[in-house]
């Protein structure tokens, strides 16, 4: 894979998440945003991408990510997923981070895909700028795998 993480949609959430990941040493990211060439919205998208050191790529190039994080709108979640998931290969993970209903997520999960392509419905609980310590249990679990390293 060319990128470890690709964002589809580079608005406020993806921008802040990319800053947080970069601060932890995770830098192999790229992003696509449908409005990146828009005369009004595009300037901010390009400024944020430059600041976060996240290259902006084509929608087609998003299929070159190990993890593809969809962070656009619940209204377009299925159509975006339908355009990307069928192109993915074994070992890639499509993560839907939109605030979509369970019915929409089930529809995305039913999109035909190659064997070994994974789908994850995930939620966003704040951003890097509003981060806080979260304690889920009394003792820290050993880390299973460092996703910053490409072992595919």
Where are these regions (language model features)?
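Rossmann-fold dinucleotide-binding core
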Residues: 77, 100-101, 106-152
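NAD(P)+-binding Rossmann beta1-loop-alpha1 motif at the extreme N-terminus of oxidoreductases
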Residues: 1-63, 87, 128
């Amino acid at each position: 894979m060319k990128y470890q993480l690709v964002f589809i949609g580079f608005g406020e959430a993806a921008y802040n998440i990319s800053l947080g990941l970069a601060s932890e040493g995770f830098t192999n990211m790229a992003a696509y945003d449908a409005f990146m060439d828009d005369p009004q919205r595009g300037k901010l998208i390009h400024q944020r991408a430059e600041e976060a050191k996240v290259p902006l790529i084509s929608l087609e190039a998003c299929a070159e990510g190990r993890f593809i994080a969809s962070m656009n709108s619940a209204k377009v979640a299925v159509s975006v997923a339908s355009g990307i998931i069928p192109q993915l290969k074994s070992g890639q993970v499509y993560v839907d981070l939109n605030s979509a209903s369970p019915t929409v997520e089930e529809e995305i999960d039913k999109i035909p895909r190659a064997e070994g392509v994974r789908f994850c419905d995930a939620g966003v609980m704040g951003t890097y700028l509003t981060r806080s310590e979260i304690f889920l249990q009394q003792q820290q679990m050993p880390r299973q795998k460092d996703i910053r390293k490409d072992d595919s």
